Amino acid sequence: PFWEVQYQDAVQYLLYPWFMVLLFLVSGMCARYYLEGHTDREFLAGRTRKLLVPSTIGLFVFWWIQGYFNMAFSHVFDQSWEKVPKAVGYLIMVLSGVGILWYIQVLWVLSVLLVLLRKIEKDRLYVFGEKAVLPVLFLLVIPVWGAAQILNTPVICVYRFGIYGICFLLGYYVFSHEKVTDRLACVSVPLATAAVVLAVFYVRYYFGENYAEEPVVNSPFSILYGWTVCLAVLGGMKRWGNRTSRKTAWLSKKSYGLYLFHYLALSAAAYFLDRYTKVT
């Protein structure tokens, strides 16, 4: 059922340039809303319990299972694995099991840095951020592009501290203001149109290349497309999605658990399909 050219991969090209960028923007906004009613100590305690513990101690207790599947997909166990000491093999599986937990690892680091920054700037940046008008919001793509060029870890390309860090801070200091998202809501239709047009050209231009690594992932086109979609989503959701239903309330309660476990379930399903069926 598979062909040499995987056209369904276009979905990944559509999502990758903006999905995590948007998630860090929203994470910064959520940090602001939480800190309006809690102390820095409460914020750090909650973030450590919810972000750091699962992504560190949790790796040794549970997420090594994800590492097992990751290594099985890579055929590591077919390469004289029996010669590796069991303790060393376990540690390798632990490291391989990080998977999607990289997001909460980065988010915890940024949360700690945010608390330190708050002690220095005393909310002056937050007050200044409310003044950001539409041209400024559009031009923020320039520092975002600049940040995308720095603080990127080698080999493991998901740890992009530069772009994710600036987006987290922009979410906290700029986009957490109702006036700012109201401005985006006023131009949500043009933004959505621009996002769709850029999406078509982006997929057409880069299809077949590795969208997750340099030079594609931090190219001017990738950042422009990703930033435009982020603004369009924030403006569109403020205009049309600013409501709560039973379904969204349920998702809010379950989203963290779905985030933690969805990849393991998908990996397990893919493993058994690959090993015990003729699908592939």
Question: Regions from the language model: what does each represent?
Answer:
Residues 1-280:
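Alpha-helical transmembrane segments and their immediate juxtamembrane cytosolic regions
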